Amino acid sequence: MEEYKTDAEIYAVLEREIIDLTLRPGSSLSENPLCARFGAPRSMIRVVLQRLQENGLVKIVPYKGTTVTRLNREIVDELIYERTAVEARVLRDFSPKCTPEQRALIRRRADAYAALARAEEIDYNKLYEADRLLHETWFAAMGKMYLWRTLQNAHADYSRFRMLDTMTSGGLDEVIADHQNIIAAIERCDLAAFEPLVCLLYTSPSPRDTERSR
């Protein structure tokens, strides 16, 4: 049994498990097993489930139970549109100002992602975080961390989509290649290249993702 003192702590655990797909879309969440798992009273679990529903992560159906929500592909597509536009602009601003030290940091982070992606047993949580860290580099360099955090926290469906993207077998070599193409564009200061490259990175695996989110 896991010991948690507050509903906020229990919420944080379940939110993370939904976003990292430990709890898949359509999975059932029952009050009794959650009470036993967290050593919490039913009233506290109900507060947690209600908050998860308010944030679009679960759906509570009276007398039937609670399930993890399916991905809303329309919302995901809009968030990808937003992410592509913002990140391409940040890259255009960053590229002419990129220092040798920043280029070296980007290379190290891209190499770290590639090493995780090519491991015999892939840790998808670490891989997802390595990808986030790489993209965070140019936002941080341009002093756009508020924008970065806003994009990361925009909607749970987007975070789940990105995790599903990361876990899509056969797609990691393409992601590594996309990273290298973005880095090459930074190094040659090819400002026109960023929007199509970022668009390709975020939209290319969609058919398999759509199937797996149903």
Q: Where is each model-derived feature located?
A:
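Basic polycationic patches enriched in arginine
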Residues: 212-214
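Short helix-capping and inter-helix turn/linker motifs at the boundaries of alpha-helical repeat units
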Residues: 5, 104, 170-173
